[in-house]
Amino acid sequence: MVASARVQKLVRRYKLAIATALAILLLQGLVVWSFSGLEEDEPGEKGRQRKPRPLDPGEGSKDTDSSAGRRGSAGRRHGRWRGRAESPGVPVAKVVRAVTSRQRASRRVPPAPPPEAPGRQNLSGAAAGEALIGAAGFPQHGDTGSVEGAPQPTDNSFTPKCEIVGKDALSALARASTKHCQQEIANVVCLHQAGNLMPKSVPRHCQLAGKVSPGIQWEEVRAQQPVSGPLVRIAYMLVVHGRAVRQLKRLLKAVYHEEHFFYIHVDKRSNYLYREVVELAQHYDNVRVTPWRMVTIWGGASLLRMYLRSMKDLLETPGWTWDFFINLSATDYPTRTNEELVAFLSKNRDKNFLKSHGRDNSRFIKKQGLDRLFHECDSHMWRLGERQIPAGIVVDGGSDWFVLTRSFVEYVVYTEDPLVAQLRQFYTYTLLPAESFFHTVLENSPACESLVDNNLRVTNWNRKLGCKCQYKHIVDWCGCSPNDFKPQDFLRLQQVSRPTFFARKFESTVNQEVLEILDFHLYGSYPPGTPALKAYWENIYDMADGPSGLSDVLLTAYTAFARISLRHAATVSPLATAVCRFEPRGLPSSVHLYFYDDHFQGYLVTQAVQPSAQGPAETLEMWLMPQRLLKPLGHSDQASRLQSLEVGTEWDPKERLFRNFGGLLGPLDEPVAMQRWARGPNLTATVVWIDPTYVVATSYDITVDADTEVTQYKPPLSLPLRPGAWTVRLLQFWEPLGETRFLVLPLTFNHKLPLRKDDASWLHAGPPHNEYMEQSFQGLSGILNLPQPEAVEEAARRHTELTGPALEAWTDGELSSFWSVAGLCAIGPSSCPSLELCRLTSWSSLSPDPKSELGPVKADGRLR
């Protein structure tokens, strides 16, 4: 009794402390559970400031043609959860920052209370599936998955029809940004939990046991034999997005023949490309553009829906009698001639060509995520939980690039066979469905013997670089993507052991030389003196798209480029005359990237102008070229290893370049420092970032092994960055190896409107207390011999007060230190006699470009 009373007394005395401790333990348990669900495969992904890790050696297997990698993080897309920085080394000082996370979803989402209306519909069994999916086997709600219309505001008052359990489903509901998407996810999960979504079994009609995987070898002797019977005709399905219209035209020019048909789907987000393709199609009777458009995201169910709808269109187009369906993207290119392809298919007119992953089906199912439930909405593929593969069939897959017979396409589109209907239902909720749907249907259909395990393509897989989970912002999975071909890969294009007629991927902004080599190999050289063979232009802004697609940084830069160019025209001979003075009118009408010999040459800005003297408005094109900024400083063997030192944004780890080619960045951007190295002795280098007022923003070490080619790191700097010229120094034992400068652009626009003084006061002031990191590195200023900051600090303070013309003058002056005017031309007649017509120059986007110009059909039915 005494002991019991003593215990009770202790409990009463410390009950508050005990309750607090229990609450903390409970909270920690919930946090651990939440992290395990959201970031199961990405430990350490905690927030914006992180300890860096070594470069990822790449994930995914070496299966031949599958894009799937492994299960990825389901991190936030629109909240504060970011992917980890890829790091080549370790910071000088470890920085830890607390991260404010959004409130996590509760463990369970309770169902909505049942309505009191007596006529409540009971969604169960097949009726439930039809209510959600629709009779055609696809989701209703218009074009669910293709994101029709503007997203609705987030509203957490959606009403699930069941109690939702499972970490994946709860994570998806917590991260979805619109009520519409949340409701769709809840509907799908409830049907799945009730067992009413997925088919339990699917009938198999193939008479062969096991997996069918025959192949065909390339035989030069047989290829030379004449074709018996009529030659086949091909329906090419071109699935394109982006803005690379010149590369698309070059592809079409290479594959075009008047006996074939070309059907082009342009992603709904690519309006500039759509306008260009519609204009192109008007000149050829056998080229058409889909009258409908979808948003086809990587790995999404919408891609399969697009293919099936396109196939139906092609079957029902009057006068289009074709024998084979071949899908291509704008990054493909032929490796053999049209004559060779037609002869080969004519000799194999009853075969379907699809590339399989191999023979390890269980591994493929896991790697591809076929045993997981996915749903597409808000341009994202959400992982919602696990599911079972239907019994009774062989599941196969591999590449989503294929060559299919018309009879098989008719079977897939028109049949009422339960095999196809139920597989459509299954693949509506599948990641990368186009990589498996046609394989699985064919291998279980009566036509299974027509399968050939070859899609007639060669793909440039480098999984060490291509499997870096670069699609985690689009899909809750880690996927892979092939690399672009370069001249050193040309031997891979010359396949001799198996028939290949196309290759991918090619990008002219990455390397155009390999296309020149391949084009010459197929069709011979262009006539001597043909212009622009080494030039490439790509539009990145068009007035018809409106300024909504431009960031404030780009809007600031493009308008400043126009002012700088017009000032140049007014002050530099031979243009420096009264009739060559112009004022810009409105925003630029277009902007192009310009490359020559696979090197970025700058921006081409087209601008409407008004002559200062009397006269009508004119349109000029201006060429702004970046200045070389790297300064090699060392003389040792280690210093000679440094090839380049760059700072930019939009780092592409697969191609190891900045997709922001001009390196334009503003105060709210998060720059990356990248170094390229030649082979040589191991070294450890220190990277130091210095802002315009000589504040040492950060410093960290990188380890460079003997065979390292590229190192890069994005330091987690506090924002906003101070505008002006920054310096990045590379040192070894505090002795200089190299140095570069980059510009943080002062913004003249904020939210597409002229910058106001109250916005400039914080946007251009740098981080609070000049603290870019939680730990100060200012102690390094003496070692680095930096000047005293007092004078530049006062100038920086005055800059925070600038708006209007004074702000534009500051912005123009900063840009002029990094960019120079390389050319100026007139699109039409000009009051300035010294201005050359753009079409007569070699650099203008309006200059001749024969390799990407289609022209009339020649006597042999071709364009090239």
Swiss-Prot record:
Its EC number is 2.4.2.26. Active with either Mg(2+) or Mn(2+), but activity is highest when both are present. Residues 53-65 have a biased composition (Basic and acidic residues). It is found in: Golgi apparatus membrane; Secreted. Disulfide bonds join C162-C190, C206-C448, C467-C480, C469-C478, C580-C832, C825-C838. Contains disulfide bonds. The keyword Secreted applies. The chain crosses the membrane at residues 16-36. Residues 73-82 have a biased composition (Basic residues). Residues 37-864 are lumenal. One of its GO terms (biological process) is heparin proteoglycan biosynthetic process. Residues 39-123, 136-158 are annotated as: Disordered. Keywords: Disulfide bond, Glycoprotein, Glycosyltransferase, Golgi apparatus, Magnesium, Manganese, Membrane, Metal-binding, Secreted, Signal-anchor, Transferase, Transmembrane, Transmembrane helix. Pathway: Glycan metabolism; chondroitin sulfate biosynthesis; Glycan metabolism; heparan sulfate biosynthesis. Residues 1-15 are cytoplasmic. Its main location: Golgi. Its cofactor is Mg(2+); Mn(2+). It is a single-pass type II membrane protein. One of its GO terms (cellular component) is Golgi membrane. Monomer. Belongs to the glycosyltransferase 14 family. XylT subfamily. Catalyzes the first step in the biosynthesis of chondroitin sulfate, heparan sulfate and dermatan sulfate proteoglycans, such as DCN. Transfers D-xylose from UDP-D-xylose to specific serine residues of the core protein. PANTHER family: XYLOSYLTRANSFERASE 2, XYLOSYLTRANSFERASE OXT. This is Xylosyltransferase 2. The gene is Xylt2.
